[in-house]
């Protein structure tokens, strides 16, 4: 698609689009009457150190807006696609520290960089089913980073009464201004052991998927 090539070839265009989207999200946030669920639990956990934040890809737009930045920095993982580039700009506009995960980057290099950020006190954020699905199917990345970092895992979801569902693979939620909404953080109670056999990992994936779905249900206004 032409617009993808244009973004790939122009960091300026990605920056302009990212700023426009961030401005729109600020408007939506400011004009929405939010009910917050679990925010205090997240803040209490952040007082003890970084966390791993996991969400379904459809909730990506408002995640940077709702993150409690004054309680701790979040390094959000993104891909290097044109949409990922714009997403990185949006995240940066809300004070986050996005990290591009290139397919050319070795697992060792990625692990080293992520662990370095955690050691700096930064939490790690990623989508459970991203970047391209299948929708609502948890991939191993969230479990791998929870295991590697030893950080507690929180799941996130939000919903607004007024919104549009985009025609994307994940049916991404686009909030509309002047409405009511709910934003949810919930701690995932399971622990990922340093070593786990395939059956145990399958059980953990199913449990994390249930936690993500539960947060989404809780967020319905």
Give the residues covered by each predicted segment.
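A cross-family acyltransferase "interaction/gating" segment
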Residues: 137-196
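Generic beta-sheet signal
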Residues: 101, 127, 155-158
């Amino acid at each position: 698609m032409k617009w993808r090539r244009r973004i790939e070839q122009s960091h300026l265009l990605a920056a302009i689009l990212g700023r426009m989207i961030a401005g729109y999200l600020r408007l939506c946030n400011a004009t929405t009457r939010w009910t917050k669920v679990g925010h205090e639990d997240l803040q209490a956990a952040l007082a003890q150190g970084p966390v791993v934040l996991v969400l379904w890809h459809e909730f990506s737009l408002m995640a940077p807006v709702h993150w409690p930045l004054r309680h701790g920095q979040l390094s959000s993982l993104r891909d290097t696609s044109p949409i990922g580039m714009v997403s990185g700009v949006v995240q940066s506009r809300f004070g986050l520290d996005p990290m591009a995960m290139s397919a050319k980057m070795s697992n060792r290099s990625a692990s080293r960089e992520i662990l370095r950020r955690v050691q700096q006190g930064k939490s790690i954020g990623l989508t459970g089913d991203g970047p391209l699905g299948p929708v609502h199917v948890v991939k191993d990345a969230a479990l791998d980073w929870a295991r590697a970092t030893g950080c507690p895992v929180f799941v996130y979801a939000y919903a607004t009464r007024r919104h549009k569902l985009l025609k994307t693979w994940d049916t991404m939620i686009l909030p509309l201004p002047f409405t009511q909404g709910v934003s949810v953080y919930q701690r995932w109670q399971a622990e990922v052991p340093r070593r786990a056999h395939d059956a145990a990992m399958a059980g953990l994936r199913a449990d994390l998927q249930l936690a993500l779905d539960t947060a989404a249900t809780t967020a319905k206004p």
